[in-house]
Structures are given as C-alpha cells and as structure tokens.
C-alpha cells in the first residue's frame, strides 16, 4: 500500500530535497471514508493522501482473479527487469518536466 503516494513523494524529495512530504494512506472503502473524514476535519492538512478501494490494493484486492502472492512475484520480477526505474526516464513521459519548471506549480 502507499506505492503511488511513495513514488510521488520520492519525486518531490528529488526535486525539493529539503521538503518534508507527509503521507497518509488507507485501504478499503471504510478506511478511505475515515481518512477523508479526518482530512475534512483538518487532521491531515498538508498531507499527500492515498486511498485504495480494495484492501491489499489493486494486486491483493477482492476483484483479483489471480493469487495475490503469485501476482506479487510476477510484479516484482517486472520491476526488477524494467528498462527504467524512474518515470522521467520513460520515453512516453513528455510533460513531467513542465510541472517541475512551472512557476505556478506548488508542491
């Protein structure tokens, strides 16, 4: 859990090393609703919030048709063998630098 938020936080830390990135995440609809209620009440001001509808996320959630343990093995192999580890290295990402260099973009 927290994979997307962690990736975003890692990129923010790369671009702004002195910035503190706080993350709060929830799994399952009940926990997501609780997280949102707490955020609305001001508990998570300044946090990067991540909510996953399925407990266990996309790979381990209730809608999966494959064994989550086997799927995790395949995913980890894919990650290990991926031609790049950072989205900025992907030839398919063409505008991420626009965010970094945009004076109106606030992190």
Which residues does each predicted region cover?
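Iron-sulfur (Fe-S) cluster-binding modules
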Residues: 1-107
């Amino acid at each position: 859990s927290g994979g997307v938020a962690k990736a975003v936080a890692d990129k923010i830390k790369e671009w702004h090393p002195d910035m503190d990135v706080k993350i709060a995440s929830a799994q399952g609809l009940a926990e997501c609703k609780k997280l949102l209620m707490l955020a609305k009440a001001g508990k998570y001001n300044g946090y990067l919030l991540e909510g996953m509808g399925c407990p266990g996320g996309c790979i381990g959630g209730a809608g999966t048709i494959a064994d989550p343990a086997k799927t995790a093995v395949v995913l980890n192999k894919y990650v290990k063998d991926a031609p790049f580890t950072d989205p900025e290295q992907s030839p398919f990402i063409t505008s991420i630098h626009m965010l970094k260099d945009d004076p109106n973009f606030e992190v």
